[in-house]
Amino acid sequence: GLTVGKSLVEDEMMPTALVIVNMAEDAGVQLLLPTDHQVVDSYDPLNSRKTIPVEFTNTGLVGLDIGVETSARFAQALEGAKTIIWNGPMGMFEEKPFDEGTIAVAKAVA
């Protein structure tokens, strides 16, 4: 229900995402979603970046990584985990500095 600006969205996966959200809610499982992210005004990582809460994303911004608050929340949730299934990076990890979220979560897993 939030605006994601120019960020990549796989529209065909929206029904699946809603099923997952509902399943987690029905099972009483906490589903952690990002609360902040690093954004730029285009896909050019050399543009000035800023970290903003996800609810303030506007149509002109592109989210390229999770923010520091989200990285910390995810790391805390991983403490003491016995099994972790990880599918994909937290952001555009191929380009610095948008690899920071993925690195932070990887360190928490290690």
Show which residues each predicted segment covers.
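Active-site loop-to-helix "anion-binding N-cap" substructures in soluble metabolic enzymes
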Residues: 1-110
